[in-house]
């Protein structure tokens, strides 16, 4: 689904692409996941890579492991890591699910 979205942006009318590219060059994120890209194409490439990386990680860990890792990451804040906060609040995180499948 996401790759179709990026392909649609690449195939957008020239005028629309120029407008998005100008906004990207001013520092605006115009593609979800394209943070820090300095042009429309750069943002699309970054977003595609991040999406593929996440999908690969999900395949390696399996759905349960990926969800468990997200649960731990979602607990982190600027003061504490996810593991510290989980321990502090009594939330159980099963890190055995983080192991990659062989």
Swiss-Prot record:
Family as reported in the entry's similarity comment: Belongs to the small hydrophilic plant seed protein family.
Protein name in UniProt: Late embryogenesis abundant protein D-19
Composition skew (Basic and acidic residues), residue ranges: 48-58
Anything else known: This is a SET 5b protein.
PANTHER family on file: EM-LIKE PROTEIN GEA1
Any GO BP: response to abscisic acid
Signal peptide (residue range): none
Function of the molecule: LEA proteins are late embryonic proteins abundant in higher plant seed embryos. There are two subsets of LEA proteins (5a and 5b), the first ones are expressed when the cotyledon weight reach 80 mg and the second set are expressed above 100 mg. The function of those proteins is not known.
Lineage of origin: Eukaryota, Viridiplantae, Streptophyta, Embryophyta, Tracheophyta
Disordered: region residues: 1-102
InterPro entries attached to this UniProt entry: LEA_5, Sm_Hydphi_plant_seed_CS, Small_hydrophilic_seed_prot
Organism, as annotated: Gossypium hirsutum (Upland cotton)
Induction field: By abscisic acid (ABA).
